[in-house]
Amino acid sequence: MATNEETNLRLEVQEWINHDPDPETSNELLESLSKDDWPALQERFSQRLTFGTAGIRGTQGSGPNRMNRLTIRRVASGIAEYIGQGATVVIGHDARKNSKVYAEDFATLLSNHDVHSLIFSSPVPTPVVSFTIREKSLDLGVMVTASHNPATDNGCKIF
């Protein structure tokens, strides 16, 4: 019989799965649920990644304590609300796994909020995003990268 804590966690995980656009991370959670792997689920849902001085970054995987497509979409939604309709944002990405997908998701979310974006089609170094903001007098810049973190991590910097 499931405890109240397990029931609440199961509901939270299911809610995450319902919004997760990535089958890989959704399946990761479904597998943990099917195995009743509460320690793994608790670790992924006991806290959320938070912004530090250099942006937000962490290990890639499922849940709010990992970098993934849903985490990126939530960050993009918050940024869109902050800068408002009609703003223009430049988005760059590095060559890490999922960086291009995260950048494209970011641009899509901004567009859904009537925020314009310029997105680099191939990987660029972080300073290129910073330069482009000033050169083109843009409102904001986003660089999808985990910077000096391990290659398995990802994240984004906001300028």
Residue ranges and their predicted role:
Residues A2-F106, H113:
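An N-terminal, well-structured beta->alpha segment
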